Amino acid sequence: MAPRFSWSFATSWHALAILALWPVSTLAGDKSAADYYVRELPGLPKDSPPIKMHAGHIEVTPETNGNLFFWHFQNNHIANRQRTVVWLNGGPGCSSEDGALMEVGPYRVTKDNALTLNNGTWNEFANLLFVDNPVGTGFSYVDTNSYIHGLNAMATQFITFLEKFFALFPEYESDDLYFAGESYAGQHIPYIAKAILDRNKLKSRAETWKLSGLLIGNGWISPQDQSSAYLKFSLEKGLIEKGSDNAQQLQHMQRICDKEMSINPGHVDYPECESILNKILELTREGSGDQACINMYDVRLRDSAPSCGMNWPPDLKYVGPYLRQPQVISALNLDKQRNTGWQECNSMVNANFRNQNATASISLLPDILKEVPILLFSGAEDLICNHVGTEELISNLAWNEGKGFEVTPGNWAPRRQWTFEGEVAGFWQEARNLTYVLFHNASHMVPFDYPRRSRDMLDRFMKVDISSIGGQPSDSRIDGEKGPDTSVGGAKNNTQQHEEETKQKLNEAKWHAYQRSGEVVLVIVIIAASVWGYFVWRQRRKGAAYSALQNDEAAGQSRTGLAAFHDRQSDRDLEAAAFDETTVDNIPLQESIGRGESKYSIGDDSDEEEEGTTKT
């Protein structure tokens, strides 16, 4: 029996060796990509094609427990190159799960916590990354007294998030990177874009991120232009009657707003101007109940007061309960100790983010447009961030050696009619790296109303080439021109294609295995047949040699012996012949054997061995 000390030392040394080989990240408690894998999402339809998903928290400020939640969907197809679209909703403080489950994500929520497929999902040709931004929004969290106050701090934290995300998922770091979102994301996205461009200048070419485009829908980009557009839009839409007392009251408020903006130009928030929107909602209120006031996100609709659109869209009543389910919380890899229940918008984030002295993102666009294309799109029925304000923004903006959509002095880029599957969808207008798209009959959340049209817009902007994929392209035309095929239907997604390719390879491997087995069996049969044939040939050769020997012996005798034998035999086979024993006795045996040996071999013990050495 070995001494106890010797056994203990060996065991301890073995344990230390294992610890030495154990990954440092494991000892430190760092997560890997596998920890974020979404294994099973509750409510998926049975016929749903498989989509690879990852979700969870990434820490951005350890000192304040600041964590951003993300939900990543892999693309269905790769069209000529890899792309990733980061989607952000607005607020500030409103969750990007609105975008994931009501706008551009692959699923929509219905009653009974069921999911259905979105036929206009933006992950058709791009990986989709939804982030609840900034900290405290949606599933993201931070210590109560540590909400951020400004756009620069937000952008810095987002760069930290991306650094850690790409460390976990390096396969996406070299993708063409796009940012998309709506409403107050019109502030977030340009600030993040500027931070990325600044970062790229400090990195080697291999470490840079390929920022390839920005898409902002009904964006709060230029507060001055949007604040001036509330009244203009309301008069154009007939919400406020021109020349009425209500119109005069609002015009007075507009003058106060304009004065404040002239004193403090370029700010993000102007309380004096926001009061105009509130007054419009108040003046257009009718009675009580769920139809009391105008829906500020879609003026064709009405809502209860004082919500005036906050209860919209209708899918919202399903999204909240779905995301609060324990099994969904578990599936999305959420920290149960930190989860306080999903809220669409966090008023605390909003209250802390209102930094009136911040510089509006409109000031960043000219420099960004030197390097990165930007697409602004608007739903024509939105009031709060309406298309009139966006069009004023463009007209007043100077970039890339021109102002507005002027292409030559006095000539502006035309508004080109866009038709989608036979219907007039809106118009496109573009010049010098900036594109503007107006969606007819659409709300503040354009992809909610027109998922397939919005994806067609995305695909055109990203210059998607689907020629190598197959499927049925959509009929999308600008000024009657078909252009490249940008939307596809009926094609299998990457996961399905990979599974089928794997199955095909397995079948091919099985066939090759069967083929090899058949070849082996055939070789064995050939060898066996050859051996059997050789055996038969040897036996017949021996018989022929013996027969020839008897003939040779008989040829040297008198007719009295052999002639008598030959005349009497009924067959040439000696064993079958009937002959007279006395005749055979008279054959001179020794002499005939000597002659026979000189001409034939009748197979002594050494013959087979000698023959074997000469075969080639």
Curated annotation (Swiss-Prot):
Keywords: Apoptosis, Carboxypeptidase, Glycoprotein, Golgi apparatus, Hydrolase, Membrane, Protease, Signal, Transmembrane, Transmembrane helix. Glycans are attached at N119, N357, N433, N441, N493. Disulfide bonds: none annotated. Its EC number is 3.4.16.6. GO terms for cellular component: membrane; trans-Golgi network. Residues 468-504, 577-616 are annotated as: Disordered. The chain crosses the membrane at residues 517-537. One of its GO terms (biological process) is apoptotic process. Residues 29-516 are lumenal. One of its GO terms (molecular function) is serine-type carboxypeptidase activity. It is found in: Golgi apparatus, trans-Golgi network membrane. It is a single-pass type I membrane protein. PANTHER family: PHEROMONE-PROCESSING CARBOXYPEPTIDASE KEX1 (PTHR11802:SF190), SERINE PROTEASE FAMILY S10 SERINE CARBOXYPEPTIDASE (PTHR11802). Protease with a carboxypeptidase B-like function involved in the C-terminal processing of the lysine and arginine residues from protein precursors. Promotes cell fusion and is involved in the programmed cell death. Belongs to the peptidase S10 family. This is Pheromone-processing carboxypeptidase KEX1. The gene is KEX1.
